[in-house]
Amino acid sequence: MEDPKSDEKFDIGISEKNLDVGFGESSSVDVPVKGRFASFLKKLELSSGPEKENIDLRPTPPDRRHYSALDIIYLWSCNGISASAFRTGTSYMEMGLSPKQALAALIAGNVFIAMPMTLNGLFGSHYHIPFAVQSRASFGYYFNTLIILLRFIAGLFYYGTNVYTGAECVQTILYAIFKSFRSYKNRLPADAGITSDFLISYFVYWVISFPFHLIRPEYLQRFFLIKSISTYIACFAMLIFLLCNVGSHVVWDQPATVSGRSWSWVFMCALNSSVAGFSTLAVNVNDFTRYVKHPKTPYVQMLILPLVAAVSAPIGIVSGVASKIMYGTAMWDPLQIANNWTSRGGRAAAFFMGLTYLVSMIAQNISDNTVAAANDLLYFFPRYLDIRRAQVIVIIIGAWAIVPWKILQNGTAFLAFLGSLSIFLGPAAGIFVADKFKNHHKYDIDEFYNPSGIYRYNKLGLNWRALIAFLCACVPLIPGMAMSINPSITMPDGVIHLYYIGYFYSFMTAFLIYWGLNLVFPAKETLLEEAVYPPKSNAELVDPSTLSGKDKFWYYIDY
């Protein structure tokens, strides 16, 4: 086994041989072409030192840890109040729940998902490494590639669908500024899946959002603050407008349309959906918590996630019910409501509503999708990609190559597949949490970068305990996933009901099996007496027991 303290301790596991595949002597490409291509690749290499260390895969140094507890609050509060988040509560009402029941499902789901997000987030706040590197400890030095690919695929497609929502924001702005834009002539064929005016809106959104993806994640906290404040102001303004027109009792007195045993399973399905909505973040939350100043900062997620659901979900529910009364159609999207404001004053309000949600969608897409997908992508190409280059690739592929408007228009089966990815990400989150308890949160930061170290487990770089736990958790849910993708497939009620609680089942099953296997067959080399951490920041060197009064209060707020 290699010495983890050697000069190669921060090698990320991609060898020179692996990086140069196709350029060896066995290559059939002629020498001139090979030479030009090799020269081109050489120019693309990052200038990160003689050892080709990628700083975005290395532990975040103290001088790049800028996030405080308030910044984490801004980060997640801006997600819960976005335009896409508003649709969730109303979709549960369409399933048959009453407004109060839909709200209860959302809050309960956020309470549950806050636990794995906090526990996995603590890994990032202590060891300051991205999810892609962290996963080596649980799945093995090479088997973690499976989970990274799943997360990358999810982030790529979710980015594209969110760009579509961002385009709706731009469309609302253009409708408000240019009255004639509503009747803009469509010059695209019907099978294009998109109209000319919306394609313009789509392109404008992508161009506006592009520069924000060039900002390194550790410097985005002020952007999240601005977004949170502006969006909450806009949301409460719309809430007041709707309630003044229809009254609060009309909204909350709506009855459920299902009852008995059917209601129970509909409620469980809604509860599972509210949890699964955060399934990607529960896996890769440390892509952001790696930038926090203090190791205890992620604990604020236990409070902020349920609180955001309790504040934002009622606004979406009110929008759906009130819009049906006012306009004759239930509009679960605040942008659709704003598009009905056609008077001079109404268009001004619609402009500010669209602008607010435009900023909101840019922030949400960064925090939910592009940073995570970029971290996953640069993991495979560490010599050539940093977080900025990787984000540029993600936003080009996600916005244009996968053609998200086609998916949203005709891709019902594919959207069902995207929604079912939580049955694979749930086991990953469960295994991460179980691994944290199994190791008593003691890891060796150097070993994460040692290809022959303790987190390799065997010659294959595979932790078989994680493989068994993963398969036991997700395989029983695959028939239900197949049914959701292709409704013509018939399944027994038991299979359907198991799929309705898929995230709960997959998370808990993976957690218990992985925990049990490690009790019976422990990987003793990974059980450390003392943890090995990266260098500590100034915040970590302060002993809060020596502080009192307002100094202690601001210590926890600022750090």
From Swiss-Prot:
CDD domains: SLC-NCS1sbd_NRT1-like
Gene Ontology molecular function terms on file: nucleobase transmembrane transporter activity
Keyword terms, alphabetized: Golgi apparatus, Membrane, Transmembrane, Transmembrane helix
Residue ranges crossing the lipid bilayer per the database entry: 103-123, 139-159, 192-212, 223-243, 263-283, 302-322, 348-368, 387-407, 413-434, 466-486, 501-521
Gene3D superfamilies according to UniProt: Hydantoin permease
GO cellular component, one term: Golgi membrane
Protein name (database record): Uncharacterized permease C1683.05
Protein family membership: Belongs to the purine-cytosine permease (2.A.39) family.
PANTHER family the UniProt entry points to: NCS1 FAMILY PURINE/PYRIMIDINE TRANSPORTER, PURINE-URACIL PERMEASE NCS1
Localisation per UniProt entry: Golgi apparatus membrane
Biological process annotations from GO: amine transport; nucleobase transport
